[in-house]
């Protein structure tokens, strides 16, 4: 499962190429991922300009604008094996099947020319093509009207661990009645968003805190030691391109290297 650094690596790789571009064509090769695509998904994306490409927790969010329409957002979650790839106008992705009308599904993609498990293709106004492949199909996409938090996927997320809202006092309050191990508490996205098993284990080890220690028994002194370590581990992973092993290359296909720095 990709965690915050992996998703942020993808965002940083794609944002310069997506922001300001218009989506001119949408091709869906199936009607669902983990969940069905929202009604009118392809039609709404086509003709929209990407005004921003951001991240919230483990979600990617594209801010979209269409003439005479309210701003809306395209939300994506990579699941376990989802990956975006961006191909230039001369790239092989332009050969992935024939153009289809928005809302239709293409099943005539040639195995000789298609990358495996590509389920979504977006053509941009500069001729480049963004593909989304997901062998296990645990990822999903949604469209959100108005503010991004107008979806249950984001509404109850805790603070970002790299933000000023994440501090020892926040954890002390959140852990006060938690009788689960601190590792489990840190994995609760309502307490802090974006953390997963890899970086929680690494941060706890570096901070000298047992992952089995009950969250309610972790005092302020230990939490004041833990918070900067979490930030340090995440930032180091982002700078290294994530801890990609196999399923999560960056948008250009390059692997991350933070796994070579693991202490645990």
Short names for language-model regions:
Residues 1-264:
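Structured catalytic/nucleic-acid-binding cores of DNA maintenance enzymes
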